[in-house]
Regions:
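Active-site acidic/histidine proton-transfer and metal-coordination neighborhood
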Residues: 1-66, 157
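Histidine-acidic metal/acid-base catalytic patches
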Residues: 53-69, 73-174
């Protein structure tokens, strides 16, 4: 969630907690916050050396809220995803599984070459999924969602099959 200043963040947290309370008490659901990379930035407002994600984890009501951790965006931000799950033990029920190709390059319109992490099919990148799944299960994660958003094959169904094949042969108990 993009917040231009600290007051906006506090207002967002207040409203999120208010909505979460309603959903939890009236319907039995917990609202979960899904991260991207910007919540982990060290440049966030420069307040007390905290990151935006630190404020969210401290200020969201643990009774009525939770977190959906996106493995790709956390890794892109330089976060150890397993350590994050351990820190949030019991508060993350859903984990988005995305892999990351570290040596991907793009050329900008002005001809510059940038090295940026790129999403790739599960099992083809740098994420250690067997260790991640083990930590996730030990910390209370119940649901795993594979997000194939970028297709190296230019064929979405082929890319999904590649991810499914990896999961079937490396992550599922036989």
């Amino acid at each position: 969630y993009a917040t231009p200043d600290f007051d906006s963040l506090k207002n967002f947290i207040k409203k999120f907690n208010e909505m979460a309370k309603i959903y939890y008490h009236e319907y039995g659901y917990k609202l979960a916050y899904h991260n991207h990379s910007e919540e982990f930035s060290n440049q966030f407002f420069g307040i007390e050396g905290k990151r935006k994600y630190d404020y969210l984890t401290e200020e969201f009501d643990p009774e009525t809220t939770g977190f959906t951790v996106d493995s790709y965006w956390a890794q892109v931000a330089g976060i150890d995803v397993r350590a994050l799950l351990e820190r949030l033990k019991g508060r993350v029920r859903c984990l988005h599984l995305k892999d990351c190709e570290a040596n991907h390059t793009v050329t900008t319109a002005d001809g510059k070459t940038l090295h940026v992490p790129e999403r790739i099919e599960i099992g083809r990148g740098t994420m250690n999924f067997p260790a991640l799944i083990k930590t996730a299960e030990q910390t209370g994660v119940k649901y795993f969602i594979v997000e194939d958003e970028v297709y190296s094959t230019n064929n979405p169904l082929e890319s999904v099959k590649m991810s499914a094949d990896y999961i079937g042969s490396h992550l599922l108990e036989k």
